[in-house]
């Protein structure tokens, strides 16, 4: 998606007040990052909510396939359609899905992101052993 929202009236820090993202690569571990930084953003921002959704999808796919999985999501701000790509890292198999519906609002409702709990994510990162109580970290058997 290139300039999917049209004309930019404001850009940079004026329109999107995130931080530099230096901690981003650490918090997101070995996953690829597109440069968006979730910190200082609430759950209505795709940088945060769709990363959590991708983590959940990867955990579910990995559990079923018994191998590591990388999930990528492409989206356009303000539109609920996403393109989802799943890569199975051992077999090299790649699947893609078009026309799926997911938005930050849907993820916010799904994961209950309107409740307090962001401080520990900023301290320890959004994934891993310190976040086992979070819905995006649960396995299928935990649900």
Can you name each region flagged by the protein language model?
Residues 5-68:
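Conserved mixed alpha/beta catalytic, RNA-binding, or beta-rich assembly cores of soluble enzyme
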Residues 1-3, 27, 72, 87:
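Residues in well-ordered beta-strands of folded domains
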Residues 68-143:
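Internal helix-turn-beta structural module
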Residues 1-11, 110, 128-132:
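Glycine-rich, mobile lid/loop segments that gate access to catalytic sites or pores
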